[in-house]
Amino acid sequence: MHAYRSHTCTELNAAHVGQEVRLSGWVHRVRDHGGVLFLDLRDHYGITQVIADADSPAFAELETVRAEWVIRIEGRVKARDASLVNPKLATGEIEVYATGMSVLGAADELPLPVFGETDYPEETRLTYRFLDLRREKLHQNMMLRSNVVRSLRNRMWGAGFNEFQTPIITASSPEGARDFLVPSRLHPGKFYALPQAPQQFKQLIMVAGFDRYFQIAPCFRDEDPRADRSPTDFYQLDIEMSFVEQEDVFAAVQPVIQGLFEEFGHGKRVEADWPRIAYRDAMLWYGSDKPDLRNPIKMQVVSEHFAGSGFAIFAKLLENEGTEIRAIPAPTGGSRKFCDRMNAFAQSQGLPGMGYIFWRKGDDGAMEAAGPLAKNIGPERTEAIRQQLGLGEGDAAFFLGGKPETFEAVAGRARTEIGRELGLTEENCFKFAWIVDFPMYEKDDEGKIDFSHNPFSMPQGGMEALEGDPLKVHAYQYDLACNGYELISGGIRNHKPEIMFKAFELAGYPKEEVEKRFGGMVKAFRYGAPPHGGCAAGIDRIVMLLADEANIREVIMFPMNQRAEDLLMGAPSEPTNEQLRELRLRVVPKD
């Protein structure tokens, strides 16, 4: 018999009754029923109930054990009485009568319990993450993650992709976030960077003549934390393909992601229709470039109904160039109480409020419009709005106005809140959409032209498009949205040096700077580069969706906290003076 176990804690069943066995694991919990001890022994695979009475040679020793001690049990498999069978356990038909016990690893008093799902402060959970990971829910999440990665690999290999590894220490590259810099000991004053993504390397793989590449790639970005984003590092399914257009990438990716969600989606419906939605339409209809299509609400522009109307705030606002009034339909939301609640929500988001109209049955039995806006713009305009939005009695509509960029994000959040409050957002399904035609450029906080997304994407229209207004240039850039999250981002790459130089020039990077920062890739493009494109899927976020978790840290084995600190390992930490001298660095005190 093996030194530690003959079986795992999920293998024993009625067929093993009468056998002598050996099990090892953690003490999940102990119950003393008047001279009979019941002990749940847990390992990676499951739980087995162990019993000992006063006649057992192991009884005295078992009385001393506490939760989370690691022990080895010798004993005999017994059938449970029919009334005591536990159908929730794989081993619920049997129990092991203990004849011997050894302590393999004692445990101090626990800072947080493993048994049960008691909610503990995140700081405590992350400081003792190794204990936190023993809890059933987190253990399941990590196994889900492992199985998702395995499935992704199998699906990519099955689709004819080849897995290659790229460097994880390289040169700094402006890709939209701050780099983590690594000082060079051999080259004082110079720094490497941890890659924000394998972007340049995967493109070089295409230039090198390989056709379909993928890897499960670690990425490093010094970002502000969010519930759906790690502040330091994450993993992505990185993909690149040669001789492809946008639709070719979509056709390769959809079977992989759709199949993955069907495999691990716990029976939730996975929509097979993945619409293409232009970025501008997504912002107009949903107030987001990662719309949740489970919510049927679609916003519309209703400016014509307020221009020159009696509602002076909107009428005057529309006299300014680039402004509009947008409506958020709210089917079944036609009560003043609900409208006031949503108005308060808008105020909590930093807006002065939202105007609203709701339709109800009047005293004469006919439908009438109510609310402050209805009184100001009159029945003809309110009826025109109702017809445009397709609303009826018992429905409502909310209104925001201004330049779209000033209110779209809040309008999107209001749409989400309205759909949730009214029960309009469909549960138990995954709905996907490709967001396409992203703007290539945007203005930064200082009013300068900058890349809005990936700087390596091909502009639609090529060089000719770059000769016009940069803010009107669309890129072959696309995202995949699912249930309100961005799962994938990608693009068709700019593989022609002259177009690349022009694209970067418009964003303020002279040719010399591009040569310096991306010299390897520019050089490669001069030696025969194929048209190519690809994308990257966020694995952490995919697992978060599949696990139905609201916080990405629940699906990462050892995550940082919201201040980008590793409380278990004590990172970041102060370097020693010797380390600083070796790197020829010194720490400058804060002012």
From Swiss-Prot:
GO cellular component: cytoplasm
Pfam families noted in UniProt: GAD (PF02938), tRNA-synt_2 (PF00152), tRNA_anti-codon (PF01336)
Site feature Important for tRNA non-discrimination, where: 33
PANTHER family on file: ASPARTATE--TRNA LIGASE, MITOCHONDRIAL, ASPARTYL/LYSYL-TRNA SYNTHETASE
Region span, Aspartate: 199-202
Location relative to the cell: Cytoplasm
InterPro entries, alphabetized: Aa-tRNA-synt_II, aa-tRNA-synth_II, aa-tRNA-synth_II/BPL/LPL, Asp-tRNA-ligase_1, Asp-tRNA-ligase_1_N, Asp/Asn-tRNA-synth_IIb, GAD-like_sf, GAD_dom
Keywords of this entry: Aminoacyl-tRNA synthetase, ATP-binding, Cytoplasm, Ligase, Nucleotide-binding, Protein biosynthesis
Oligomer status and interactors: Homodimer.
E.C. no: 6.1.1.23
Chain's role: Aspartyl-tRNA synthetase with relaxed tRNA specificity since it is able to aspartylate not only its cognate tRNA(Asp) but also tRNA(Asn). Reaction proceeds in two steps: L-aspartate is first activated by ATP to form Asp-AMP and then transferred to the acceptor end of tRNA(Asp/Asn).
Name of the molecule in the record: Aspartate--tRNA(Asp/Asn) ligase
Family designation: Belongs to the class-II aminoacyl-tRNA synthetase family. Type 1 subfamily.
Binding residues for ATP: 221-223, 486, 538-541
PROSITE patterns for this protein: AA_TRNA_LIGASE_II (PS50862)
SUPFAM superfamilies: Class II aaRS and biotin synthetases, GAD domain-like, Nucleic acid-binding proteins
GO molecular function: aspartate-tRNA ligase activity; aspartate-tRNA(Asn) ligase activity; ATP binding; nucleic acid binding
NCBIfam families in the cross-refs: aspS_bact, PRK00476.1
GO biological process annotation, one example: aspartyl-tRNA aminoacylation
Binding positions for L-aspartate per the UniProt entry: 175, 221, 453, 493
Catalytic activity: tRNA(Asx) + L-aspartate + ATP = L-aspartyl-tRNA(Asx) + AMP + diphosphate
